[in-house]
Amino acid sequence: MSGLHRSSSSSKNIGNCLPSKELLDDLCSRFVLNVPEEDQQSFERILFLVEYAYWYYEDNAVENDPKLKSLSLKEFTSLLFNSCDVLRPYVTHIDDIFKDFTSYKCRVPVTGAIILDETYERCLLVKGWKGSSWSFPRGKKSKDEEDHACAIREVLEETGFDVSKLLKREEYIEFVFRQQRVRLYIVAGVTEDTVFAPLTKKEISEITWHRLDHLQPASNEVITHGVSGLKLYMVAPFLSSLKSWILKHPSPVARRPNKPLKALCVWNARTSVGGNGTATVESQNRKSELRTTTMESNSRKPELKRTTMESHSTKPELRKGTMESHNTTATVESHNTKPVVDHSQDIKPGGSFINFKFNQSVILQALESGNSA
C-alpha cells in the first residue's frame, strides 16, 4: 500500500500542543523498551518501533485530544529521542539515523496480490489515504515472514479480504525496482459481490474494481498514467506480464463483449462510516485522478500497527515516480520456471549503523529505576 502512504491527522486536527514528556515516555516504554532484545540491536529495527509509536500517537492520542499537534514521523522521532533517556545520547546523530532508516525501508522486499474478477476483465486496486495514485494491495515483509504469508496479511489489512484459499504460491509476477524486490501473486476468480473494507486506519481511501483495458499505458513513453487518466505508478510495470498470464490461463467465465463490465467502487472512506459503500466509478472521479499531488516521503507508510512487531517493515513501499524500464526486471513464475533468488537476506539489519551501539545496560538500568520509583 503500500506505494501507499498513511496520512496523519493534520487535515482534521488543528491542535498546536506538542506531546508531553509523560506521554512520550509512555510511548517509548510501550513500543521501544518493552520489546524482545533482538529488536533493539540496530537503529533500523528501533526506528520501526518508533514508527509504531508514532502511528499510535496519531491514531489515538491526536484523535482523542484536539489540542495535540499532528506531527510528521521525523518530528515525532526527534521529540521521542530527546525525551527518552535511553535514546537521548543519540540525538546528535538523529538526521543520519533517520536518513539511513528511510533508505533501508526502500530495500525491504514487498509482496501482495493482483486480484482478478471471474471474467479476468477487471482487477482490484486500492488508493492511498492521501494522494491519487492507485496500486495493487501489497506491503513490506516482516522479519522471517514468507512471501505468500506477507501477501495474505497485507491484502487482508488493506482490503479486509482473505486470499489464503485462492492464492497459489507458484503463480506470481515479480519485479525488482532498483534494490527492492516486489512480488505480486495472481489471485483470480473473485466474485463481484465480495465485500471489501480495509482493516487499517488512514491508509486506504478507496477500493475499486478497474477494467484492465482502461489501465493500459496511454503510450509506450508514458507508463505512469492509463488511458483513463488514472495514476498507475505502482500498476503499469505489471500489466504486460499480467496480460501474458491471462492469455495462458483463460477465464472459465465467458466474457460478454456486447455488455462489458464497468469499473466499480466497492469501498470509499468518504461514504463508508463503519460500513461498505458501493458506487459506479464516474468520469468525474477520473478527472480528480489527474490532479497533481506532492509525492509523500517513503517514511510515511508504516502500515497498520502490527500485532507482531516487524523488524523489517511495515505499508510504503515503492517510491512513487516514473519507473523506467532499465531500472526494473520482471519474472512471471509458474510450475515450469526457476524460482527467483531472494537477496533480501543479503541486507543485514544494522549494517548502515555500524558505528552506533544501542546500550542495553542503560535500558535495563532505566527500567529498574522506573520500577523502584
Swiss-Prot record:
Bias (Basic and acidic residues) ranges: 298-323
Q: Which Pfam families match?
A: DCP2 (PF05026), NUDIX (PF00293)
EC code(s) of this entry: 3.6.1.62
Q: Which UniProt keywords apply?
A: ATP-binding, Cytoplasm, Hydrolase, Magnesium, Manganese, Metal-binding, mRNA processing, Nucleotide-binding, RNA-binding
This chain belongs to which protein, by name?
mRNA-decapping enzyme subunit 2
Disrupted gene: resulting phenotype? Lethal phenotype at the seedling cotyledon stage that are small and chlorotic, with disorganized veins, swollen root hairs, and altered epidermal cell morphology. Altered RNA decay.
Task: Indicate which residues form the motif PDZ-binding.
Answer: 370-373
Which cellular compartments is it found in?
Cytoplasm, P-body
Binding of ATP occurs at R178, Y233
Q: What is the lineage of its organism?
A: Eukaryota, Viridiplantae, Streptophyta, Embryophyta, Tracheophyta
Question: Which CDD domains does this entry report, sorted A to Z?
Answer: NUDIX_Dcp2p_Nudt20
Native species of this protein? Arabidopsis thaliana
Give the UniProt family note.
Belongs to the Nudix hydrolase family. DCP2 subfamily.
Gene name, Swiss-Prot/TrEMBL: DCP2
UniProt cofactor(s):
Mn(2+); Mg(2+)
Free-text activity regulation comment from the record: Inhibited by the product 7-methyl GDP.
Q: Which cysteines are cross-linked by disulfides?
A: none
